[in-house]
């Protein structure tokens, strides 16, 4: 349930965090995951070492899983 008293919309019953703060946090984590994915793609094109590629792939997948877990825990 949303309450819009005082100008800022707040989620009632969810620790009363402002909706704007929640959206900022979501966007920050999403940006981080996107940047890491783009970085991985660029390095993937340049790197020939299979061990490095495997490590990069694991790091990107961990980042994506963190973002999904964040969504599950907070929504």
From Swiss-Prot:
This is Uncharacterized 8.5 kDa protein. InterPro entries: AcMNPV_Orf29. It comes from Orgyia pseudotsugata multicapsid polyhedrosis virus.
